[in-house]
Amino acid sequence: MLVLGLETSCDETGVALYDSERGLLADALFSQIDLHRAYGGVVPELASRDHVKRMLPLIRQTLAEADCVATDIDAIAYTAGPGLVGALLVGASCAQALAFAWDIPALGVHHMEGHLLAPMLEENPPQFPFVALLVSGGHTQLVRVDGIGQYELLGETLDDAAGEAFDKTAKMMGMQYPGGPEISKAALQGVPGRFVFPRPMTDRPGLAFSFSGLKTSALNTWQQCQSAGDDSEQTRCDIALAFQQAVVETLTIKCKRALKQTGLKSLVIAGGVSANKALRVSLESMLGELRGHVYYARPEFCTDNGAMIAFAGCQRLQAGQKEDLSISVQARWPMEQLSGL
């Protein structure tokens, strides 16, 4: 089965072709980072308009790269949520229109299920069951995964997602959008130990997260340094390092706790923050101690992309899942509502 995948949940327009027998044939991506940088964050209306502008050219590019034509495509998978409603509607409308014109099925895919399954596109994919850490700008969740659609939420953030905390902390210190990569880059020049921030909710049982207090601690420290006349680039780097260390250690502690609670030895990390090198090193070290394994997607598939949507959609389409041509998207969509295969 050859599936065309469309991703438009936020500020990346992603298109890919995935074949159930030959694997990923082609993928293309346009990032709107430069468009939104001047505003310090994603502007939903601008995001939607740019998706409209980019979608069809990217589809043509992907078909050409895979040496395919429209009649080769068996189905279309598109992101139906969660995400920005206007952006989601662009992808959904395009998918349903093409499906109607080509007389093929179209299926809405859960954005975070796409992220969760993205490591399965790699040469050494994880095997069920496993624990997944979904960590991005909008989500921080620990999920037990027994199969596609068989998800048990173990814990999630009570306030800010980890990626959101990275972005907001960077913005508070005058760094460019997106803040996550800027924090990581600055942390490389930081002096260890100059600042120490709390590891939120690690001193109590459970698998819930909270990053709003950590973000506030970083802000207060930066403002105190500014008041003392020390707002140098080195101070910014030192705070970035301390902040990143706190987030990474918090995530690692919770992942270790989830693995022990479930008795599993395999961990998948997915979502934009999974590209963070410090997080990968920390989790690999922890899994080494437990004699387990950690899996993640290649860096370009950690952020939003069409490949993960094409793959996730293909699994559900092959299992016989169908939907009509109505256009429906969801800004919020708990993964527990998904049906198992």
Swiss-Prot record:
Gene: tsaD
Keyword tags: Acyltransferase, Cytoplasm, Iron, Metal-binding, Transferase, tRNA processing
Annotated Fe cation binding sites: H111, H115, D304
Stored InterPro entries: ATPase_NBD, Gcp-like_dom, KAE1/TsaD, TsaD
Superkingdom: Bacteria
Any GO molecular function: iron ion binding
Compartments, record wording: Cytoplasm
Note accompanying the cofactor annotation: Binds 1 Fe(2+) ion per subunit.
Protein name (database record): tRNA N6-adenosine threonylcarbamoyltransferase
Disulfide cross-links: none
Residues involved in substrate binding: L134, V135, S136, G137, G138, D167, G180, N276
General function of this protein: Required for the formation of a threonylcarbamoyl group on adenosine at position 37 (t(6)A37) in tRNAs that read codons beginning with adenine. Is involved in the transfer of the threonylcarbamoyl moiety of threonylcarbamoyl-AMP (TC-AMP) to the N6 group of A37, together with TsaE and TsaB. TsaD likely plays a direct catalytic role in this reaction.
A single GO cellular-component term on record: cytoplasm
GO biological process: tRNA threonylcarbamoyladenosine modification
Reactions mediated catalytically: L-threonylcarbamoyladenylate + adenosine(37) in tRNA = N(6)-L-threonylcarbamoyladenosine(37) in tRNA + AMP + H(+)
EC number: 2.3.1.234
Classification via Pfam families: TsaD
Family from the record: Belongs to the KAE1 / TsaD family.
Cofactor field: Fe(2+)
Organism: Pseudomonas syringae pv. tomato (strain ATCC BAA-871 / DC3000)
